[in-house]
Design a protein with these regions (language model features):
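Short acidic-glycine loop/turn motifs at beta-strand connectors
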Residues: 54-59, 110-113, 148
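Short, glycine/charged-rich beta-strand-loop motifs at protein surfaces that mediate ligand recognition
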Residues: 126-132, 149, 153-154
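Peripheral (often C-terminal) accessory segments that flank ATP-dependent C-N-forming ligase machineries
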Residues: 140-196
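A long amphipathic alpha-helix within ATP-dependent nucleotide-binding catalytic cores
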Residues: 34, 72-112, 117, 121, ...
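A short beta-strand motif that forms the metal-chelation/ATP-contact edge
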Residues: 52, 62-65, 114-124
Length: 196
């Protein structure tokens, strides 16, 4: 802990419940307070997700970096695509280093001009609609690959500076209208409090 800013967080979605650690005493407290914590260096810089699609041989077909401009509860509320060669190179390096197949998203922060990876997820990211809207239809290309079709490299083929904003909306119903709404039972995983 000495000399390095750290944080402790529970294993969860979106870093919810993360705590900055400023001393050995705080570290001891959070190690006792948080079940199975992840302790890592605290990274202060712009956050990015890099959406990657790898073919069956692990070759990256598409790499699309996105800046996570506004994040709420671990989910992107506002973001934009960025044609940043440094981030595209990070995607290439991850694909070379790991045996990846299919969709992958890499989370990183740029600190002092250097991208630092803090997470690699072998799945679609929550912000994949922005990547698709920018012209990188990764789900469609994944289907084509699954059907045995060859998909050529699409790296760099997306609209730079495509913005997305998400929002919640409230729906107001009177008693008669709510009576017509059928209740939805939560899936077993949601009932246990796991991320969907």
């Amino acid at each position: 802990v000495t000399g390095v800013q750290t944080c402790a967080l529970p294993i969860c979605r979106g870093g919810i419940g993360a705590f900055p650690i400023r001393s050995a005493r705080e570290l001891d407290f959070f190690l006792d307070y948080v079940d199975n914590p992840v302790v890592q260096e605290y990274l202060d810089g712009r956050e990015y997700t890099i959406d990657i699609l790898c073919d069956g041989s692990g070759r990256p077909v598409s790499i699309v970096p996105r800046e996570r401009v506004v994040i709420r509860a671990g989910v992107i509320d506002r973001g934009r695509t960025v044609a940043d060669d440094r981030l595209i190179d990070v995607g290439r390096a991850v694909a070379r280093a790991l045996p990846l197949r299919g969709p992958v998203n890499v989370q990183c922060r740029v600190v002092d001009g250097q991208p630092i990876i803090f997470e690699v997820n072998p799945r679609f990211s929550g912000g994949i609609p922005l990547t698709i809207a920018a012209g990188a239809d990764i789900p469609r290309w994944l289907v084509e690959l699954t059907l045995g079709r060859r998909v050529g490299s699409r790296i760099g083929q997306f609209t730079d500076q495509m913005w997305m904003t998400s929002y919640e909306t409230s729906i107001f119903l009177d008693q008669a209208q709510i009576a017509d709404v059928q209740p939805v039972e939560p899936r077993a995983s949601q009932a246990r409090g796991e991320a969907a």
